[in-house]
Amino acid sequence: MARSTIVLRGLRREYPSGEATVVALRDLDLTIEPGEMVAVMGASGSGKSTLMNILGCLDRPSSGSYQIAGRETASLDADELAALRREHFGFIFQRYHLLPELSALSNVEIPAIYAGQSRDERRDRANGLLARLGITDRASHRPNQLSGGQQQRVSIARALMNGADVILADEPTGALDRRSGDEVLRILDELHADGKTVIIVTHDASVAARAKRVIELSDGVVIADRATSTVSPAVAAPTAAAAQAQPRSRWPWQSRLDRIGEAFRMAMLAMAAHRLRTFLTMLGIIIGIASVVFIVAVGDAAKRKVLADISSLGTNTIEIFPGKDLGDVRSSKIKTLVVADARALRLQPYIDGVTPTVSTSSTLRHGPLEANALVNGVGDQYFAVKGTKLSAGRFFDADGLRDVSQDVVIDEKTRQTFFSDDPDGPIGKVLLVGRVPCRIIGVTQQQQGGFGSSQNLSVYLPYTTVQARFLGNSSLRSILVKVNDEVTTKAAELDVTRFLTLRHRVKDFVILNTDDIRKTITNTTETLTLMIAAIAVISLVVGGIGVMNIMLVSVSERVGEIGVRMAVGARRSDILQQFLIEAVMVCLIGGGLGVAVAYGLAATFNALVPMFQLGLSAGSIIAAFICSTGIGVVFGYLPARQASFLDPLAALSRD
């Protein structure tokens, strides 16, 4: 490390005080050579503390020149001044200024973290310094577990951590008893003997007498500058300890990772120190994240349920009805939609299945029981087109259509109505449909509520049977068409429209496209989900504002800590990073708890409503964590920036 000659020329420091100006230092000229031990004396208000703050780059002169190791400090920015404090100066404060959350060892290590030393390097050096100062057995103790003398020794070890060549001691014995004070002065004598430049600010003449040179101030002016001994100043040569302090060459990212690790550690300590406040801060994030994740899960489940219900109408299907359009009051009088149309459509290459449908209502009877039901006349491909499954028996086939058979397939509701107490089941039994006796050959599985389901009883007969035995005409209620997977239902709809218009010579039919219904309802579901999620996002924003508020409080509470870190060499970016990471950690942990709450809500909902199952997608969870991190960055930046722009001297003064 380059030896630091301190040169002050015409240095002046003024402070505004209302409408007046207070002059703390007046046109000071001073030179301190490397290796000197200097005492700066003066009464309260003489300017000695102001001089020490300027010498340690904690404050700037109003005018004049201050050079350290040949560098003019007036031209340096905040980070360059931090580098000077980190590399050239070691501070010993009257009030110690140790961080209460950290052990003695960790307090000593702080300057080395900002200097880029590796964890092993700084741990070894810190232990060595504590051993040299006789408090190695207190390395794991926190400041409140140490005596005043022990705390001051930790402060001295911290000042020596980076091998500083200038030690600035502000009333180092002022808060100590006589015995502890003598030990501290002995240590300062040893540092001077090692070649350090030692500058002691004191009002005690007996302390000043230990120095080789005494500078007296009064009203900001040097009134005396005298040597107390004829002994020559120590030769300013780098000592082994100083050489050891130089960090070995490391990649920049390694130093950056160390500083980030320190920031994470301090964030966790700060959060643990105020558990209730931290939890209440997280609560807004927890509620917001849980709401968003849960609502997205509900929206996805609703969409799946709707799509499953629409699938009950048949996937990739279109249905053709008589009439100019849906709801045409004259549709019942249009008799042009016939079985021949269905047979012609079946020959088209883009058609996978076609079934004519007719329907009527009738009374079902079995033994003493009777009930009204919907009688559906369908083709043999109907069940495949609709995706209907059996719980028992079989479907009728093309032979049943041709033979106008009286084989009937009943639904689950019909089975429960007429055969719930029959141990043999309904298969093979005779069911009277109106006046037509029918043999039950199959039972369909029960459909959940939704599209394609009905509270009415339903039975299925060949459409030929219904036309001949119930309706007495050949016209159809509709033709249900399943389109090949290679063809879109929209394209098939256009082709079917052209085909039937040519056959009928007029467009006297309307086509219902289930995919259009699917898209409409899906879009509606997504819109509703988005609207509800937007409301939930508001709670996230409120939570983010809470994070900002608490971080501002945290900054105001930890001004002293910020000042200490800046005094030992922390850059503005280090302070910004520390408080930003703390805000992000609060939001990330809140986000994790929010996801856990959403899981709990989903599990409870699934247990209470088994027919409507919620599932949390990985995408929504990842989005939740990204969102919570973003909230931490956005709402934590302002408090973190405020912390990083604090004046180090003002921060130390407010501790």
UniProtKB/Swiss-Prot annotation:
Its EC number is 7.6.2.-. The keyword Translocase applies. It comes from the Bacteria. One of its GO terms (biological process) is response to antibiotic. It is found in: Cell inner membrane. Keywords: Antibiotic resistance, ATP-binding, Cell inner membrane, Cell membrane, Membrane, Nucleotide-binding, Translocase, Transmembrane, Transmembrane helix, Transport. The chain crosses the membrane at residues 279-299, 528-548, 579-599, 618-638. Its main location: membrane. It is a multi-pass membrane protein. ATP binds at residues 42-49. SUPFAM superfamilies: P-loop containing nucleoside triphosphate hydrolases. This is Macrolide export ATP-binding/permease protein MacB. It comes from Rhodopseudomonas palustris (strain BisB18). The gene is macB.
